[in-house]
């Protein structure tokens, strides 16, 4: 399908650097601001429930852990096992979240942001796609103007993005325009890997394996296509009854593929043995349509996000065992970018945006639209990030490969979180 050009009326990307505050404000000091941002629920008054701040404050200050230096010394002496050392490092990171602030914002799009990808080797560079097909390449570590690639407008939504692991000056995209393609930073199309040639079929997801040199992409009618890096199609099969919302290759066993769908299933496949739609290794039924399925960085777990109120964590060596269930409000809404939970790249932590639901079992009267951090082992909520000046729903939240900077998508806006001192230096 030939790309359509869009009128030259796109606004200039807006990037805002947040100045360092003189001191950290307590939740009590923020309470008057939060009152203005709360949505009045059925039968509720405009009075803000101060008990919510008390609960949030208790989450915002994790208990102190033992000295990391001591833990490293004990590990060196052989008196501390690696898991305990890893747990100590994770707790230290959780403690640092109290200092995280939004230090940069960008609002470059005229339609909401729909996808997000971090550069694999430049920890201050990310790519963000929009519903209009626009793409922003932003290195927030320098003062240069971000690179803006204009899309086609309506019908051009970027549904998936990934930097090319073989050449990080290029990136893959899947889109509602009906293509999965490889582009450079100037917006030139280097190769079209898949094209529907019809407006009724579009691509919703993609992933890339550098080891196997393959690209996998899924469409809105249930097909999954596997191609090599030269663009040659290896197979094209209908693996689901409905839209394939997410495809993910295991980072350690790159022949292991997970596909998620609005048909309320996640399926696990061995790429070496795919013969047809029934050749999956495991089918993991869900109660609701599924937005995403992410393997953990070590490949040992699978994280799924449905379109209602459930996050699941499966063990990759025990697919038949019941998963860990994490109740969490993130319901689907037509004009909201689907909420997807993601892994922290270094610790067994899950990060996901909250969409308060009055019908959710544990919903508070004036619940905030926070970014929630869960322990991947216990399912316990460990921390909640919140900025009253950016109180919208954070649909996408991903840490950079270093694990020290968080990018969030909130409607039209891109937000970058970092420890306050580090953010000021950046």
Swiss-Prot record:
- Give a short account of its post-translational modification: Phosphorylation by ABL1 negatively regulate UV-DDB activity.
Identify the residue span(s) of motif DWD box.
255-273
Its GO biological process annotations read: DNA repair; nucleotide-excision repair; protein autoubiquitination; protein polyubiquitination; pyrimidine dimer repair; response to UV; UV-damage excision repair
List all Basic and acidic residues biased stretches: 1-11
What InterPro entries has UniProt attached to this entry?
Answer: DDB2, WD40/YVTN_repeat-like_dom_sf, WD40_repeat_CS, WD40_repeat_dom_sf, WD40_rpt
Any single GO CC term annotated in Swiss-Prot or TrEMBL for this entry = nucleoplasm
Q: Where is this region: Photolesion recognition?
A: 333-335
- Using the UniProt annotation, give all residue ranges assigned to the region (Required for interaction with DDB1): 67-78, 86-97
Q: Which residues in this protein are found as N6-acetyllysine?
A: 35, 76
Q: Where in the cell is it found?
A: Nucleus; Chromosome
Record GO terms (molecular function): damaged DNA binding; protein-containing complex binding; ubiquitin-protein transferase activity
Reading the lineage from the top rank, the first entry is Eukaryota
Alphabetically ordered keywords of this record: Acetylation, Chromosome, DNA damage, DNA repair, DNA-binding, Nucleus, Phosphoprotein, Repeat, Ubl conjugation, Ubl conjugation pathway, WD repeat
Keyword Phosphoprotein set for record: yes
Pathway noted in the entry: Protein modification; protein ubiquitination
Q: Which sequence positions carry the modification called Phosphoserine? A: 26
Q: Where do the record's region annotations for Disordered lie? A: 1-33
Relate the assembly described in the record: Component of the UV-DDB complex which includes DDB1 and DDB2. The UV-DDB complex interacts with monoubiquitinated histone H2A and binds to XPC via the DDB2 subunit. Component of the DCX (DDB1-CUL4-X-box) E3 ubiquitin-protein ligase complex DDB1-CUL4-ROC1 (also known as CUL4-DDB-ROC1 and CUL4-DDB-RBX1), which includes CUL4A or CUL4B, DDB1, DDB2 and RBX1. DDB2 may function as the substrate recognition module within this complex. The DDB1-CUL4-ROC1 complex may associate with the COP9 signalosome, and this inhibits the E3 ubiquitin-protein ligase activity of the complex.
Task: Read off the domain note.
Answer: The DWD box is required for interaction with DDB1. Interblade loops of the WD repeat region mediate most of the interaction with DNA. A hairpin between blades 5 and 6 inserts into DNA minor groove and mediates recognition of lesions and separation of the damaged and undamaged strands.
Q: What is the designated name of this protein?
A: DNA damage-binding protein 2
């Amino acid at each position: 399908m030939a790309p359509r050009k869009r009128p030259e009326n796109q606004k200039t990307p807006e990037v805002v650097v947040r100045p360092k505050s003189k001191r950290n404000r307590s939740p009590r000091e923020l309470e008057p601001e939060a009152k203005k941002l709360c949505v009045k629920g059925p039968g509720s008054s405009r009075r803000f429930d101060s008990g919510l701040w008390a609960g949030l404050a208790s989450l915002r200050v994790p208990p102190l852990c033992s000295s990391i230096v001591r833990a490293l010394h004990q590990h060196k002496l052989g008196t501390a096992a690696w898991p305990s050392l890893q747990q100590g490092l994770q707790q230290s990171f959780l403690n640092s979240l109290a200092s995280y602030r939004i230090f940069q914002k960008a609002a470059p799009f005229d339609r909401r942001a729909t996808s997000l990808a971090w550069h694999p080797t430049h920890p201050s560079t990310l790519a963000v796609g929009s519903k209009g097909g626009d793409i922003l390449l932003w290195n927030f570590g320098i003062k240069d103007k971000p690179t803006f690639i204009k899309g086609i407008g309506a019908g051009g939504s970027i549904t998936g993005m990934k930097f090319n692991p073989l050449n990080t000056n290029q990136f893959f995209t899947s889109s509602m325009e009906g293509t999965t393609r490889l582009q450079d930073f100037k917006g030139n199309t280097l190769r079209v890997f898949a094209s529907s040639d019809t407006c009724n079929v579009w691509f919703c997801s993609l992933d890339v394996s550098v080891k196997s040199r393959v690209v996998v992409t899924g469409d809105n009618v249930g097909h999954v296509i596997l191609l090599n890096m030269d663009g040659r199609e290896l197979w094209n099969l209908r693996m689901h009854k409905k839209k394939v919302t997410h495809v993910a290759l295991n980072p350690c066993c790159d022949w292991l593929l997970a596909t998620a769908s609005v048909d309320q299933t996640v399926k696990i496949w061995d790429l070496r043995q795919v013969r047809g739609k029934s050749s999956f290794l495991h089918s993991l039924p869900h109660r609701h349509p599924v937005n995403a399925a992410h393997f953990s960085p070590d490949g040992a777990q699978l994280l799924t996000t449905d379109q209602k109120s459930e996050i699941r964590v499966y063990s990759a060596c025990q697919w038949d065992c019941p998963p860990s269930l994490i109740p969490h409000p993130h319901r689907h809404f037509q004009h909201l970018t689907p909420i997807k939970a993601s892994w922290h790249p270094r610790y067994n932590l899950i990060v996901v945006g909250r969409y308060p639901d009055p019908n959710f079992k544990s919903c508070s009267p004036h619940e905030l639209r926070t970014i929630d951090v869960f322990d991947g082992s216990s399912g316990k909520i460990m921390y909640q990030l919140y900025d009253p000046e950016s109180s919208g729903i954070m649909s996408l939240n991903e840490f950079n490969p270093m694990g020290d900077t968080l990018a969030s998508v909130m409607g039209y806006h891109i937000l970058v979180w970092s420890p306050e001192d580090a953010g000021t230096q950046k």
